[in-house]
A protein has these predicted regions:
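Cross-family detector of peptidyl-prolyl cis-trans isomerase
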Residues: 2-314
Length: 314
């Protein structure tokens, strides 16, 4: 059996290109469920720790399906642009042999879900709307694994596989806090697309000469500290410019960083904020040296950021 870091193993093995669904209720988030899996797959052990998994082999899955073994109650996977911490143990359905497992709780790197779609895309719809804190068993028939998936796993072509996923953490796809009223004049305004992506409207007039920030959405999640490793969306524009110089939205997934390692104005603005919040930040032109180095921001101009705080790792 191979034991791989979570990012490597799940990137290679687990297809999670997920479609959107409502996070409000499990009933509005249908997942293809096959209750027969429960009669042939057994996974024991605490959630978040490597489970002992057995399969009553030879098991020949007739169709792809999912069975929830532990039902979580946290954030649901609702977008293919989210980040997540996921562990997985994989078994050969025909022999019951364990093929690969991640390191379980040792990896604190949040993985973009779109990156987890490479080898076995047929897993994608089976994890739709799975909640943080859930352990799910997924059975994939050989016909859905395909030659590439079988080779990646090390099973004979035509044989199926069983995956047991522990979904340790699911990060927000966008800030979901309550809108806040701000009376400050001279600050940019923010508009949002349906998926939450912000657009920045720069007002007429000169930029502020001191760093300023506003909370424009207030979340109710964990409080961010200077030592926090945060998952954030960032949209950055130069004052008066019409195009972004930095955009995790355009990159396709949020980023992860330690707050104290961010440019000073950004770090100061989000420290003390809560997960789910969206923060508007203006950095005067004479304070952008760190932004130029870290984010390739343009020189000699004020900068404007919108930061969505999507979660704290650890």
């Amino acid at each position: 059996m191979r034991r791989l870091p979570a990012l490597v193993a799940v990137t290679a093995l687990a297809g999670m290109g997920l479609v959107g669904c409502s996070a409000s209720a499990a009933s509005s988030c249908p997942t293809p469920t096959d209750s027969s899996i429960a009669s042939v797959v057994d996974a024991t052990g605490d959630f978040g720790s490597a489970p002992t998994v057995s399969v009553r082999s030879p098991f020949v899955p007739q169709q792809a399906g999912t069975q929830t073994l532990i039902e979580g109650d946290g954030q649901r996977i609702t977008s293919d642009k989210q980040l997540a911490l996921v562990d997985v143990t994989v078994l050969d359905a025909a022999t019951g042999a364990q093929l690969v497992a991640t390191q379980y709780a040792d990896d604190k790197t949040a993985t973009p879900l779109p990156r987890l779609t490479q080898a076995i895309p047929s897993i994608a719809p089976l994890l739709n709307c799975v909640a943080e804190g859930s352990r799910v068993a997924v059975a994939i028939p050989g016909s859905d694994l395909g030659a590439q998936g079988a080779q990646a796993l090390g099973v004979n072509e035509g044989d199926g596989a069983v995956f047991v996923f522990d979904v340790r953490k699911v990060f927000l796809p966008a800030a979901d806090g309550a809108d806040q009223y701000n009376a400050d004049s001279g600050m940019p305004s923010v508009v949002r697309a349906p998926d939450g992506q912000p657009g920045i409207v720069i007002p007429a007039g000169d930029a502020p000469t001191a760093a300023r920030s506003q909370t424009i959405k207030k979340g109710d999640g964990d409080v961010v500290t200077a030592d926090s490793s945060v998952v954030i969306h960032v949209q950055g524009v130069a004052w008066g410019a019409k195009t972004t110089f930095a955009s995790t939205w355009k990159n396709g997934s949020p980023g992860q960083a330690t707050v104290s390692a961010l440019p000073p104005a950004l770090a100061s603005a989000i420290e003390g904020e809560t997960v789910g919040s969206q923060v508007l930040v203006v950095v005067p032109a004479d304070q952008t040296q760190a932004d130029q180095q870290a984010l390739q921001a343009p020189a000699d101009t004020a900068l404007v950021y919108v930061v969505d705080i999507l979660g704290v790792v650890g």
